[in-house]
Amino acid sequence: MDQREAAGGAGSIADVLAEYPVIDLTVTNGERWPCWWPMQMPFQQKVWNWFAESGAPAPVHAYMGPVQVRWITLDDHCGIHVDAPSHFVPPADSGLPHAGLLGRQTGVQISLTDLMGPAAVVDVTELIGAGGPGVSPWITPDHLRAWEARQGPLRSGEIVLLHTGWDRYYQPWPAGRAYAFDPVVTRAGPGWPAPRAAAIDYMRGRGITTLGIDAPSIGAAHDALSPHYTGLEHGMRYVENLSGLDQLAPRGAYFIFLPLKVEGASGCPGRAIGMRRRRA
């Protein structure tokens, strides 16, 4: 592609972007937001350098000149992120349960092509509120079959996005307790809808490699393990903490997730977008 085509020639990238506007599917990371898993490293953001020593917000640890610089602390499953197999699969030579060759596959080894593709947006919002205190309602193969009866079979290479509607609870504290803290820690609130292991097997049988959800985890509030093992042991990729899936049609959008490239990461935060054809 020459410079004229890239800038705006017929069939150029600019033409595609004009036809397919970008939709941000990413939650906000911040100290007031429920962007980290309860009981894990909380997200922190601090000022390292301010423009001038006079009137500087605290804490300021350096004076480097007339610039603002901040530092952040986050674990590798903070905010929207992709789970690598090594998140739940130990190395094959560890002697631990569920150990396997994929236990050495970290976030940087996930191919970017696995994290972009046509989206199949499965609406399961009817399950909101169906769980008990600390318990998630299950997304089952029957939910997937019902969607396929309306939209056609899931296709190999599609990225399945489970639209639970749970992102409505992604709010600043204290309202944000309902997102993950109350379902997991206090057990005072219901859990988010989560796919049963059989549903993950069903999708894998359809050729699905990448699965996303607009909730804190693919795992359930009461069972984080079995949904993770079922997919990650077979090289599936899980994108968690999506938002705004209601802006995408069941089919017709293109999904892209670009993770940070962090050596040895068991998961990689990043930015997710959907590209939806502009309506006439």
What are these regions (language model features)?
Residues 1-280:
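Active-/binding-site microenvironments in catalytic and ligand-binding cores
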